[in-house]
């Protein structure tokens, strides 16, 4: 860790370095522990327990862990074993970092001394505890063994402690002598001698006495060493012992102290008297202990085999006389109790090095009891008495081994830690045979290794009996607490699966029965078998034994899944047998060897022989071995004799060899069927120990031969049953070696050639030996050999097959041998002999011989097939097919000359078929595969399918055949796994081929073939469905799931996954076969299509609820999809189709209310072809739903997925042509003639048909549906802000795609028009920016919409169906078209869509022959637009007479047509008042009823009626009485007293309007208030009426802060909002002008400037308001225009400069100047706020006129000041006469300082406008204090930044405070400060910015102190004006962008709203001119809308430069002004 030092602190030099005293402290702690232990030790035996704990604490203290504390011996041992301890980093580090220490160091010496004393005293303490133990336990016979064990153990421990002490200090002679005594007690002469010599040895290890005076230790050691050497008879060494002795008297006195431990045993006086078993120097026999894994023959054989392997690796373990001892309980029942200990022993021994076996426990002394009668021969006798050996059992052990154990203690500690972490696993059941015990001693199976991963912590598992007892107790407890019917519970949970299976079996079964296939098991039988297999009761399972071959398969499959183990896992992981054929072509093998391998059926027929499980004989064998003293080879040989000799090697009771007939004696090899693992161990033992076994058997044969040769007539040779037993064993070994050689000599064997040669030689030797032994039997055996004829036949049979393996043997010789064998069988009357344990010759019978003969006769034929070189497919087909497919052979009718040859060929074929029937199923499969490959080569898929089906039939026949059923359970299960793997591979390829070649897959299959294939598949389906029933039981909890873990779990999962996929594939094939069978037998089925569909539905349901649809790559679902979509009518199967599509692609097409089942199928990506097929089905579903509901349903997302899969439409010439035609039509101008023709239905476009795939789905309405859904989605969403129009763009794309394909769909035109309408509305609803700045785009949308509406009407008239739905849609079309026309004619769109200004063309004049520019046709008139809209709205009313909107919009059209001028009307007939009023009354009558009292009523028709009636009465068209009578239609006017005359009309109509406003609770409707203001003001237009109108408007429209509150009602047309706001501002400005309200006008001015997006023609509006405001300012100051010229024109520049400087410095201005200054400031701020939006010349004129007036009224004071200055100058002239360089112009003494005076211009010029502007700004900044910000806490304070820097105090009259601190208000009553919020915004800026600007200016010019130079040309004479830097600062951004003012709530529902055109509103109509034609520079508005009116009133304003205003160049320069 780095340290830092303070630089300002001197270090203390007296600080001492820190010393690490940790070691000293630990040594002190250890000394305290040592003293405590010594104290307790010395207090006697009663404290020995505490002393033991104290010593343990001492020896485990830290000092013993130091590297230097480790002894040299242990240190070297650790270094040597470093390579074996890589995982123990701490030990390695300790070994690597042993430090060198000095003994002179005090710490090191103290440490060593402490360690030395600790070990020495601990050893002494151990001996003291032993002495106390001996005193407390007197020697008795029952405790003798325990006492001896304790003596040995504790003596050993004490010697170990003494050794540790001597390692630290080897000069302790007394300790050496004590160690010698302990060695004496341990019976080790060597250690005694070593210790005694160490006492006497010098530095050179020479024996001598080192002192003149002998010490006690030397004296005693000298005598004891001499005695020890004499006992060993080592006289030479005795002579080297020093002879110096003390006095005898002293010796006698000290004799009693000679033995320090008299209570310990001692060595005898001579070595000859020593017990050899206890003498470590003696050469004694050792015992090699074997621990079999289980009490089975295979496990015992495996342990023997492992011992042989260990002996080959390290022969030192098996010294002379090493015997074998089995560590095995006597009975199987005792095994379980002892297995845990065995596991622990194995764990302890597992850490031995050099690959020692886990069951090797070397012992020098073993306990072998008296031998009893045993089956093993007794070949070794012991000369010693067993009792003497037993006496000292466990007493002695090799001291060397104990020393080694001590020295390696650290390593053992590590191993102990590892052992503690080892998980204790369940002991395997002894009844189960270990799958691969050959590797048990060296390598664990992969499954067991993986299982350890799942053991999280070491747990001692309960035994099986304990777990069962706990489970029973728990179950009984639960049954007491809760009583319920468990079976009923599971039946209820299984009910879903049962119902699905019942539907499936009831559907499939009858269909198959009609075809003659009755193999489908009944569901009840399947469930019964499944319940029996799942039963936990053994009684119930035994009562339900399989009654058929299929039931055996059910039970085997169930057993496979439940008892999954390593063997099954290996079978699963290995390649299936049929797969090996795939590599035939790549193998360089002869056809003969391949043929020989697969030409026989399986040899294992378990029904013929019982299984070999004789534990009693095995127990006797183990006991006998333990009781005898046998070598390893002898034990192995004895084990083999038990298995290979008759009657386990025993001789029968009767030993009369001359008996005429011996009893039949069979060996375990012949009589029983061995487990595979046992046979494997026998073979391995025979091969590995062949030399010893062969020598023993040869010696026996030689001894027999010697006996034969030595016999005499008097003593004839007797051939006993022992000789026969050896013959049996020899023949058996010969047969086993023959089997081994046959297995390694096959084509697929990977055994190397050397091993084959060795085994061939071994087989030859045993063959000769067996022949010799058989000859002895034949020559000298019993006279009647009937009972033993089998041994003769076996030898001849084996010899024949042995000869057949030789490459140079002719086939004819083998055939002759076989014929002889056959004759011998008949002659001996032997039907058959079964050797189940030999795969080479499993059966010896005439049938087997016939098979072999047939095989040899067929050799040429099969060699040709099997040879890899035979690749001609036609030849293979002609060769193989007649054999495997007899029905394919037709016997031609030919002449008799060919009968003989034909008969011969048929006989040959018959023989080959017979051979195949007797042969292996693998051979048949291989033939089918070769035939299939041949058909694949000629590309004929139907026959390939047939070969696959025949392969399936072959495997099913094999599984149902006797060869399979006769196997043992284990073999059957392994075989079933392999056959199922083969079936899975075949089915996978077969299903793929059938689905790919669905049209011709079965074209070559006749009905018989179909029936046999369907039967085989049905059998397989039954088997696989039994597994499905098992899984159902597991799924509901009825049956526990498999508990395997690790790799076993993974392999089991793979197997079960294959079973599920196979079942799915079986159903696929079953359906395709059924479909073909129905085609061939259509007369058997009444409704074949429904039967097929029902088949698929029932199977889909049964698979789906089990989540199996996804298996086999969803091939079943894809088959169903293809079948269902091929149906002509899909309505009846919509739910099934929806389920299929959901399972396949995850798309939900189900309508609301229908439930889809979750089958857990991962969705696939939808492909284009499937998506196109789905279009028709999806369209049918979509047509049933409302389009608004569709956009919210899941079907909408499904439609999007389908469109995404379809992708973009590919372009084609017809499609491109149509696109050009359509685009040209939409871009064309609106031709009135074409519009009227379209309305009559005669318009059309010349589109051409598009012959593409996309045209089909377009014709069906796919693109229209997509466009309509996108349009509806946009129009149905409630919008509060502008939203992206991507949905509309998508709708336009899809509608145009539909029209591009020439569909002629009128509704596509209509919806496309609505889409363009929606885009237009979205552009003009939220802001007026596009109306002001981008009208071209708006015109395009309008024109496109009108074109589309016109074409929609034309197309609909021609092709629309007259259905009610179509008529309703047509009515909507007419309504929308009419509203579109009317809206385009009114503001703000103003007929721009009908303009032809952009469509002028050049024409040639025929008369003048000149070109001229003109319009293509006459523009559509305004009245024509209204008239056409009226016509369309009337058409809409026909079908929807109850639509109030139709009547309302019709009334608006009629009103415009009624109130227009004659110039607009033209020759058209005038609209009658009755028609106008009737339409309004109809609109009110058809208004919908309010839903509840809280809903807002619809005011538009009511207000329109009031407005129009008022105008009609005002014009005189109606009388007041008629008007009031008409207004009775609206309920709001019924309670108002009708007027009697014209004078009473105004109060009446105002009251009606007031009631309308009162009814509008939410204040959405603004036009009633404005109408009331106009009614109040329009008649008189005086000041009083103006004030009343203003009051009316400020109640709702304009707030106190002049915020414009105009909301957009629900039915107001988009864009009209901005028309109304513009009109209202004009009207209100005129009222303020008339009322001379400059304060409110100032605030309104700011609002208008800020909200550019809220007004139409904002620039024109701003200019007009500014002119009005300027007029009000001039009026307030009584200033006329041009006043500046009258004042400044007569004076010159110098006078102007001088006088303005004096004016600015006047201490007191003339009366009236304050008002002018305020007005001047307002004018300057107005110019800043304008920011060049309008031309500034008018504003500059206003400023100049105001400043000239101020100059004018203050001129008298200025002149007076000038005179005073002249007088002062005259007084001092005489003082300046002698001065040089006097100024040309005298300067008054009181004038401004020289630094402030402007520099002279050099020439006389006029007074520039810029100079006046600067002077005005300067004097305003000096004479007026800046306006203080409003002190409001609720909103940020707004401040007005000064236009200049802080003004200098003129003469002390101004207080020395900043303008912000003063906050002074003007006293002028009409001042601009008298606004509602007491503030001004004309040039406000943040306080922070002001202070920053001031600070920057002071830093730049530190000497400039609040003074301004009077020089007008100087840039620093005045601060930067609004045109300069300050303008930039103000214009940095909009400070109130988020404040929504003047706008309205513009988010409304669809619909149209009010019309704002008031025909006779004089002022507004006059002001409403073509302002939008003016093109001024305009900025962009912020477009914000009002959010809350009350907040707008309370919120303070900040002035801003509107974003988008044109920036001013050279802003830092003052703007020049024209003079």
Swiss-Prot record:
Keywords: Chromosome partition, Nucleus, Transcription, Transcription regulation. It is found in: Nucleus. Residues 319-467, 1780-2019 are annotated as: Disordered. PANTHER family: CALCINEURIN-BINDING PROTEIN CABIN 1-RELATED, CALCINEURIN-BINDING PROTEIN CABIN-1. Its main location: nucleus. Residues 380-407, 1808-1817, 1888-1910 have a biased composition (Basic and acidic residues). Residues 334-347, 411-426, 1852-1863 have a biased composition (Polar residues). One of its GO terms (cellular component) is HIR complex. Has a role in a nucleosome assembly pathway that is required for the integrity of heterochromatin and proper chromosome segregation. Belongs to the HIR3 family. Coiled coil: none annotated. Residues 1826-1851, 1864-1874 have a biased composition (Low complexity). Residues 1875-1887, 1925-1939, 1947-2003 have a biased composition (Acidic residues). The gene is hir3. It comes from Aspergillus fumigatus (strain ATCC MYA-4609 / CBS 101355 / FGSC A1100 / Af293) (Neosartorya fumigata). This is Histone transcription regulator 3 homolog. One of its GO terms (biological process) is chromosome segregation. Transmembrane segments: none annotated.
């Amino acid at each position: 860790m780095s340290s830092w030092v303070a630089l300002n602190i001197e270090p203390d030099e007296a600080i001492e370095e820190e010393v690490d005293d940790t070691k000293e402290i630990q040594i002190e702690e250890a000394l305290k522990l040592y003293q405590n232990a010594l104290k307790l030790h010395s207090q006697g035996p009663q404290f020995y327990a505490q002393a033991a704990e104290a010593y343990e604490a001492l020896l485990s203290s830290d000092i013993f862990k130091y590297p230097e504390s480790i002894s040299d011996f242990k240190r070297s041992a650790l270094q040597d074993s470093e390579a074996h301890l890589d995982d123990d980093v701490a030990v390695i580090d300790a070994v690597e970092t042993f430090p060198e220490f000095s003994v002179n160091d005090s710490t090191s010496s103290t440490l060593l001394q402490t360690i030395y004393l600790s070990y020495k005293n601990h050893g002494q303490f151990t001996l003291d505890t032993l002495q106390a133990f001996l005193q407390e336990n007197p020697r008795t016979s029952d405790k003798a063994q325990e006492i001896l064990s304790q003596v040995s153990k504790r003596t050993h421990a004490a010697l170990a402690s003494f050794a540790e002490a001597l390692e630290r200090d080897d000069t302790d002679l007394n300790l050496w002598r004590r160690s010698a005594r302990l060695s004496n007690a341990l019976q080790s002469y060597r250690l005694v001698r070593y210790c005694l010599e160490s006492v006497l040895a010098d530095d050179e290890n020479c024996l001598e006495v080192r002192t003149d005076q002998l010490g006690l230790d030397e004296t005693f050691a000298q005598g004891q060493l001499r005695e020890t050497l004499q006992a060993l008879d080592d006289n030479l060494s005795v002579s080297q012992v020093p002879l110096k002795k003390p006095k005898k008297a002293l010796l006698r006195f000290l004799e009693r102290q000679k033995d320090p431990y008299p209570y310990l045993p001692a060595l005898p006086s001579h070595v000859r008297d020593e017990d050899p078993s206890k003498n470590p120097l003696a050469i004694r026999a050792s015992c090699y202990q074997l621990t079999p894994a289980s009490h089975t023959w295979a496990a015992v054989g495996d342990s023997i085999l492992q011992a042989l392997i260990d002996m080959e690796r390290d022969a030192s373990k098996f010294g002379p006389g090493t015997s074998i001892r089995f560590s095995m309980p006597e009975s199987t029942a005792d095994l379980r109790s002892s297995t845990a200990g065995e596991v622990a022993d194995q764990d302890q021994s597992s850490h031995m090095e050099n690959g020692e076996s886990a069951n090797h426990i070397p012992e020098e002394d073993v306990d072998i009891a008296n031998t009893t009668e045993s089956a093993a021969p007794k070949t070794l006798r012991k000369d010693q008495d067993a009792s003497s050996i037993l006496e000292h059992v466990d007493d002695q052990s090799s001291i060397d081994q104990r020393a080694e154990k001590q020295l390696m203690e650290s390593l053992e500690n590590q191993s102990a830690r590892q052992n503690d972490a080892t998980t204790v696993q369940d002991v395997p059941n002894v009844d189960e045979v270990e799958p691969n015990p050959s590797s048990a001693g060296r390598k664990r199976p992969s499954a067991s290794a993986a299982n350890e991963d799942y053991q999280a912590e070491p747990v001692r598992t309960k035994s099986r009996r304990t777990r069962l007892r706990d489970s029973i107790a728990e179950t009984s407890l639960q049954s007491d607490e809760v009583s319920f019917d468990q079976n009923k519970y599971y039946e209820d949970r299984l009910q879903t699966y049962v119902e699905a299976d019942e539907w499936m079996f009831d559907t499939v079964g009858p269909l198959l029965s009609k075809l003659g296939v009755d193999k489908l098991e009944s569901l009840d039988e399947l469930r019964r078998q499944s319940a029996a297999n799942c039963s936990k009761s053994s009684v119930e399972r035994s009562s339900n034994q399989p009654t058929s071959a299929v039931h055996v398969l059910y039970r085997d499959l169930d057993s496979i899944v439940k008892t999954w183990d390593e063997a099954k896992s290996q079978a699963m992981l290995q390649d299936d047998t049929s797969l090996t054929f795939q590599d035939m072509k790549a193998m360089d093998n002869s056809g003969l060897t391949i043929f020989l391998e697969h030409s026989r059926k399986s040899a294992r027929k378990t029904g013929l022989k019982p299984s070999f499980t004789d534990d009693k004989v095995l127990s006797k064998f183990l006991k006998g071995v333990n009781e005898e003293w046998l070598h390893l080879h002898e034990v192995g040989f004895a084990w083999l004799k038990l298995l290979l000799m008759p009657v386990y090697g025993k001789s029968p009771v009767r030993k009369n060899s001359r008996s005429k007939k011996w009893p039949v004696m069979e060996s375990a090899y012949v009589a029983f069927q061995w487990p595979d693992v046992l046979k494997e161990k026998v073979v391995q033992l025979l091969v590995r120990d062949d030399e010893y076994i062969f020598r023993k058997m040869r010696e026996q044969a030689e001894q027999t031969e010697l006996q034969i040769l030595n016999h005499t007539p008097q003593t004839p040779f007797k051939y006993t049953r022992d000789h026969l037993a050896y013959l049996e064993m020899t023949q058996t070994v010969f047969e086993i070696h023959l089997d081994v050689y046959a297995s390694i000599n096959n084509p697929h064997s990977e055994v190397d050639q050397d091993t084959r040669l060795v085994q061939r030689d071994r087989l030859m030797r045993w063959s000769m030996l067996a022949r010799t032994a058989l000859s002895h039997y034949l020559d000298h055996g019993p006279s009647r050999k009937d009972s033993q004829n089998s041994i003769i036949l076996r030898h001849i049979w084996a010899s024949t097959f042995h000869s057949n393996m030789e490459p140079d043997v002719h086939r004819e010789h083998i055939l002759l041998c076989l014929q002889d064998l056959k004759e011998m069988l008949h002659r001996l009357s032997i039907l058959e002999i079964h050797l189940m344990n030999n795969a080479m010759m499993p059966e010896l019978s005439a049938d087997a011989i016939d098979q072999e003969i047939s095989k040899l006769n067929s050799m040429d034929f099969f060699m040709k097939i099997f040879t890899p070189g035979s690749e001609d497919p036609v030849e293979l087909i002609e060769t193989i097919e007649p054999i495997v497919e007899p029905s394919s052979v037709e016997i031609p009718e030919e002449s008799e000359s060919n009968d003989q040859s034909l008969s011969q060929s048929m006989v040959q074929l018959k023989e080959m078929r017979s051979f195949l029937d007797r042969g292996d199923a693998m051979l048949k499969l291989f033939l089918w595969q070769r035939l299939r490959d041949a058909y694949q080569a000629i590309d004929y898929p139907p026959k390939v399918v047939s070969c696959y089906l025949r392969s399936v039939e072959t495997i099913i026949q094999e599984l149902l055949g006797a060869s399979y059923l006769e196997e043992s359970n284990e073999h059957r299960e392994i075989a079933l796994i392999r056959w199922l793997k083969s079936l899975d591979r075949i089915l996978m390829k077969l299903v793929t081929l059938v689905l790919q070649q669905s049209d011709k897959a079965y074209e070559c299959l006749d009905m018989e073939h179909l029936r046999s294939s369907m039967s085989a598949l049905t059998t397989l389906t039954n088997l696989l469905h039994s597994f499905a029933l098992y899984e159902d039981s597991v799924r509901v909890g009825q049956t526990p799931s498999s508990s395997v873990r690790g790799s076993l779990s993974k392999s089991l999962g793979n197997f079960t996954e294959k079973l599920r996929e196979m079942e799915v594939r079986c159903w696929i094939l079953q359906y395709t076969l059924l479909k073909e069978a129905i085609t061939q037998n259509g007369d058997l089925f009444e409704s074949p299509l429904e039967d097929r569909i029902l088949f698929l539905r029932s199977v889909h349901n049964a698979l789906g609820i089990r989540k199996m649809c996804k298996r086999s790559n969803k091939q079943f679902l894809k088959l169903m999809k293809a079948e269902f979509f091929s149906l002509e009518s899909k309505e009846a199967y919509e739910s099934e189709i929806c389920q299929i599509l959901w399972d396949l692609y995850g798309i939900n097409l189900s309508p609301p209310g229908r439930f889809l089942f979750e089958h857990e199928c991962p969705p696939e990506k939808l492909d284009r072809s499937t998506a196109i097929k789905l279009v028709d089905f999806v369209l049918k579903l979509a047509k049933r739903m409302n389009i608004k509901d569709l956009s919210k349903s899941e079907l909408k997302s499904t439609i999007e997925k389908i469109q995404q899969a379809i992708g973009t439409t590919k372009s084609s010439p017809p499609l491109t042509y149509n696109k050009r035609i359509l685009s040209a039509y939409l871009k064309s101008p609106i031709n009135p003639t074409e519009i009227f023709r379209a309305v009559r239905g005669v318009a059309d476009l010349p589109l051409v048909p598009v012959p593409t795939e996309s045209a089909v789905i377009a014709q069906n309405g796919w693109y229209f549906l997509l466009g309509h859904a996108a349009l509806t989605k946009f129009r149905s969403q409630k919008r509060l802000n502008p939203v992206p129009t991507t949905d509309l763009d998508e709708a336009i794309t899809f509608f145009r795609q539909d029209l591009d394909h020439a569909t002629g769909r009128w509704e596509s035109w209509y919806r496309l028009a609505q889409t363009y309408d929606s885009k237009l509305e979205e552009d003009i609803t939220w802001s007026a920016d596009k109306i002001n700045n981008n009208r071209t785009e708006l015109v395009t949308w309008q024109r496109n919409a009108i074109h589309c509406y016109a074409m929609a009407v034309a197309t609909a008239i021609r092709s629309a169906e007259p259905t009610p739905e179509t008529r309703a849609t047509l009515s909507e079309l007419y309504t929308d078209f009419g509203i579109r026309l009317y809206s385009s004619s009114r503001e703000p769109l103003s007929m721009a869509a009908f303009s032809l200004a952009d469509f002028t063309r050049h024409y040639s004049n025929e008369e003048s022959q000149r070109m001229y520019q003109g319009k293509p046709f006459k523009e559509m008139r305004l009245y024509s637009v209204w008239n056409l809209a009226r016509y369309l709205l009337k058409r809409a009313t026909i079908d929807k007479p109850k639509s109030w909107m139709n009547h309302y919009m019709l009334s608006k059209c009629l009103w415009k047509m009624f109130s227009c001028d004659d110039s607009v009307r033209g020759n058209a007939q005038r609209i009658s008042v009755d028609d106008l009023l009737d339409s309004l009354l109809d609109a009110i009558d058809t208004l919908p009823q309010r839903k509840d009292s809280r809903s807002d009523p619809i005011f538009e028709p009511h207000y329109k009626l009031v407005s129009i009636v008022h105008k009609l009465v005002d014009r005189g068209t109606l009388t007041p009485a008629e008007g009031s009578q008409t207004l009775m239609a609206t309920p709001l006017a019924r309670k108002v007293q009708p007027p009697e005359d014209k004078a009473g009309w105004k109060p009446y109509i105002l009251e009606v309007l007031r009631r309308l406003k009162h009814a509008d609770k939410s204040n959405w409707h603004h036009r009633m208030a404005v109408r009331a203001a106009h009614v109040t003001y329009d008649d008189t237009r005086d000041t009083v009426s103006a004030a009343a109108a203003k009051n009316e408007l400020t109640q709702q429209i304009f707030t106190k802060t002049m915020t414009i509150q105009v909301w957009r009602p629900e039915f107001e047309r988009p864009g009209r909002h901005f028309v109304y706001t513009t009109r209202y501002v004009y009207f209100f400005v005129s009222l303020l002008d008339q009322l001379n309200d400059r304060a409110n006008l100032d605030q309104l001015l700011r609002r208008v400037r800020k909200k550019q997006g809220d007004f139409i023609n904002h620039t024109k509006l701003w200019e007009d308001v500014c002119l009005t405001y300027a007029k009000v300012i001039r009026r307030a100051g009584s200033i006329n225009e041009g006043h500046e010229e009258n004042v400044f024109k007569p004076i010159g520049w110098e006078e102007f400069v001088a006088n303005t400087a004096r004016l600015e410095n006047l201490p007191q201005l003339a009366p009236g100047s304050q008002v002018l200054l305020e007005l001047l400031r307002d004018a300057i701020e107005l110019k800043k706020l304008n920011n060049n939006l309008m031309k500034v010349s008018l504003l500059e004129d206003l400023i100049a006129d105001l400043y000239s007036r101020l100059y004018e009224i203050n001129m008298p004071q200025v002149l007076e000041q000038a005179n005073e200055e002249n007088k002062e100058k005259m007084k001092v002239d005489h003082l300046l006469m002698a001065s040089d360089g006097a100024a040309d112009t005298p300067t008054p003494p009181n004038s401004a300082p020289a630094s402030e005076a402007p520099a002279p211009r050099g020439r006389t010029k006029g007074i520039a406008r810029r100079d006046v502007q600067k002077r005005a700004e300067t004097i305003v900044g000096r004479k007026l204090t800046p306006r203080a910000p409003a002190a409001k806490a609720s909103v940020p304070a707004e401040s007005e930044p000064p236009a200049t820097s802080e003004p200098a105090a003129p003469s002390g009259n101004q207080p020395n405070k900043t303008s912000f601190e003063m906050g002074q208000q003007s006293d002028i009553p009409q001042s601009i400060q008298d606004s509602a919020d007491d503030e001004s915004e004309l040039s406000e800026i943040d306080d922070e910015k002001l202070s920053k600007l001031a600070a920057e200016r002071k830093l730049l010019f530190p000497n400039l102190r609040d003074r301004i130079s009077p020089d007008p040309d100087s840039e620093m004479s005045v601060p930067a004006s609004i045109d300069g830097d300050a303008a930039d600062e103000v214009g940095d951004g909009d400070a109130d962008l988020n404040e929504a003012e003047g706008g309205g709530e513009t988010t409304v529902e669809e619909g149209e709203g009010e019309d704002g055109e008031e025909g006779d509103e004089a002022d507004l109509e006059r002001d409403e001119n073509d302002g939008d034609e003016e093109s001024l520079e305009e900025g962009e508005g912020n477009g914000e809308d009002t959010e809350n009116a009350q907040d707008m009133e309370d919120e303070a304003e900040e002035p801003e430069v509107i974003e988008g205003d044109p920036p001013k160049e050279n802003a830092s320069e003052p703007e020049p002004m024209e003079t």
